[in-house]
Amino acid sequence: MHFPRNPDLHCHSLFSDGTLAPAQLAQRAAAAGVDLWALTDHDTIAGLYDAQQAASAAGVAYLTGSELSTTWHDVTVHIVGLGVDPGNAALAAGLDGVRASRTPRAREMARLVERETGADGAFEGALRHAGNPQLIARPHFARFLVERGICRSSSEAFQRFLATGRPCFVPQQWATLEQAIGWIRTAGGMAVMAHPGKYPFSASQRSKLFEQFTALGGEGVEVVQSAHNTEDMRIYTGIARRFGLFASRGSDFHSPSESRINLGALPPLPDGLRGVWEALEGRILWPQ
């Protein structure tokens, strides 16, 4: 088995809320020394063909992926599906259903942005920043607020207006854990808990989440992640060992101007953990 030296299995393109095309991401990953890469756009597989072609041209090993939105106990929890078959009908239908709920949410968010800031044309402004009109999300509104001079950065836009509990946040009921994991497994992929350190759960709630996740067929957890500090990595190393999960590593890169770290700029997995690539070797597309 080939063990990658610098895998990055979580990032976003303009097909969801990133700012670069899949080909630009593949080139950036190669330049950063990433040797196993996955594009994991939110609730879509639209960019995967472009990503595969670009990864091959850049000489980078490639895994298919998508980041699915779910709701668990009224909190949005993201599940990354790695190694999925992009042609699977059940996965495509499930993602279509999730995306269909995004436009009404975006229109309500636009109404709140206009009410709170006095800036008109918020929906159209966010849409200009969205590479996929079916996937208008909070980062697109953040970029609109920066464009209009209301905020100096996307992070300020989230802190003032768009984060959970802020005046322009619109809660949403996404897919269930069972649905998302089912779609991923039906498509031949592995369900991986994305950036668990970001969720506002107590230790007991965290245990219940992973008990349900593994019972439903979840097999991986992001241990090394741009959102995780040293303590988070310690906690989720323990979770991986306790529940027998494979460990993943991802930058969650969105944009050269907005992301805190570049593709691949992460510490290695802690010793003793099994990387998700060990279970997905047969789904990895190696460069020729």
Which ranges hold each PLM region?
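Short, low-complexity, intrinsically disordered N-terminal peptides in bacterial proteins
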Residues: 1-4, 284-288
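Structural recognition of alpha->loop->beta junctions
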Residues: 208-223, 261-287
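Extended substrate/RNA-proximal surfaces in nucleic-acid metabolism proteins
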Residues: 54-211, 272-274, 285-288
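A short acidic, helix-capping loop that chelates divalent metal ions and anchors anionic groups
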Residues: 90, 258-259
